[in-house]
Amino acid sequence: MTTDDRTLLPLRQKILLGLTILVGLFFLVSYNLGLIDPGKLTLFILFYSFGVTMWLLAFETLVDLDDNRIFFIWLAIGLVQFCFYLLTKDNENFKIYRSPNIDPNSFLNNYISDTTTSSLKTLLIFLIGYKIFNTIMKKLTGNCLLNTYRQMSWSHETIKRKISGLDVVFNLLLFVVIILSALTR
């Protein structure tokens, strides 16, 4: 790898980073200017937060996170999204109204989020989980964590190594982390 190659981000990262930033800015402008119906905007924010993180997990973009430059770019975006979550978690515009038939003291009401912007914490929590699992993976095997979704064989084409059982377990755990962080308070 030449010096010029190390300064460039992979095209898949440029595309995902660009889309993530542009869509996030579009949502911010849309909210402030009232360009999108608030009900639809809250749904879009939920899918946006969940979708970006799932994209990182399911595609070769997960392998790119082993590069600290790329990881810290995503960490900065995750911190910005987390700040927006903190700023909006009590905002009535993003409130989820549940059926009156649901017991207010039930497990569901105690742990499931009551705002759509709670999904904005997903990227940060995912990245923390990724860093922990990738560190464990490197200590145990000497290899970085691979994405196992969409793989048609036990060989990873991008990295050119076999997918291990640990890759699969950590991918499943990261998927659970995404779901839980998107839906819980």
Q: Each PLM stretch: what is its role?
A:
Residues 5-10, 70, 99-120, 154-163:
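Membrane-interface segments at the starts/ends of alpha-helical transmembrane spans
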Residues 9-18, 41-44, 65-74:
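Membrane-interfacial loop-to-transmembrane alpha-helix junctions, especially the N-terminal start
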Residues 12-27, 37, 111-133, 169-178:
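Alpha-helical transmembrane segments
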Residues 26-37, 57-63, 84-99, 180-185:
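Juxtamembrane "helix-exit" motif on the non-cytosolic side of transmembrane helices
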Residues 47-48, 68-86, 160-166:
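Transmembrane alpha-helical segments of multi-pass membrane proteins
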Residues 132-185:
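C-terminal membrane-adjacent module
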